[in-house]
């Protein structure tokens, strides 16, 4: 998907962030307090690198015109590294805000492409609503941020044998060409 987007937009700059290779730390009470400081709070030196990483990830996300999220399904949901990234960019006043009418997304105007891999089949099946907490979660979060242009490319059934895997990957590859 990224390569097709670069071919159609040769001047585009790409920031590649491999969350499996360099996963952000998961939120805990100490980090959450530093991300949402009260008046007079001074972050401890030990958190400065985490806060800088958070700002880098958030700035990258906000500056992007297109965000491509590679999201394998792990036990019906997203990998914890992806959840940790989402926790870092979900910032009141930056990606969303609360109003008297309810939450309002502040990160609209961009396109999000979710490239999903799944060992089984979920889309369009009885399992979709009950067991697919991956795609629904990602759509909900991006929608909460105000993003409405969301495309999902699925490679489903990749653990269901060699033929099913080849078919799933071929179908997903064709979808990426249409997406660019």
Kindly give the residue locations of the regions a language model identified:
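Glycine-rich phosphate/pyrophosphate-binding loop and the adjoining helix
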Residues: 124-180
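Short, glycine/serine-rich, charged loops/turns that create anion-binding
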Residues: 21, 119, 157
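N-terminal beta1-alpha1-beta2 submodule of the flavodoxin-like/Rossmannoid cofactor-binding fold
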Residues: 1-71, 78-80, 84-87, 91, ...
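Hydrophobic/aromatic beta-strand patches that form the interior of the parallel beta-sheet core
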Residues: 15-17, 113-115, 151-153
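Short catalytic/ligand-binding loop motif for oxyanion handling, primarily in non-cytosolic enzymes
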Residues: 23-26, 76-78, 122-124, 160-162
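A generic structural signal for alpha->beta connector loops
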Residues: 11-13, 109, 147-149
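Helix-loop-strand module that forms the ligand-binding subsite of alpha/beta enzymes
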Residues: 48-136
């Amino acid at each position: 998907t990224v390569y097709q987007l670069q071919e159609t937009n040769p001047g585009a700059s790409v920031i590649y962030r491999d969350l499996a290779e360099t996963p952000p730390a998961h939120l805990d009470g100490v980090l959450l307090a530093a991300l949402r400081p009260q008046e007079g709070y001074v972050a401890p030196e030990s958190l400065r690198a985490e806060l800088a990483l958070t700002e880098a990830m958030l700035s990258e996300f906000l500056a992007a015109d297109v965000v491509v999220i590679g999201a394998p399904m792990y036990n019906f949901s997203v990998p914890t590294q992806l959840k940790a990234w989402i926790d870092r960019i979900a910032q009141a006043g930056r990606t969303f805000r609360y109003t008297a009418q309810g939450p309002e997304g502040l990160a609209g105007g961009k396109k999000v492409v979710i490239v999903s891999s799944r060992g089984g089949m979920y889309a369009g099946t009885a399992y979709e609503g009950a067991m697919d907490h991956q795609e629904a979660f990602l759509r909900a979060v991006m929608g909460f941020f105000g993003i409405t242009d969301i495309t999902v490319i699925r490679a489903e059934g990749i653990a269901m044998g060699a033929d099913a895997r080849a078919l799933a990957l071929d179908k997903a590859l064709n979808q990426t060409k249409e997406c660019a």
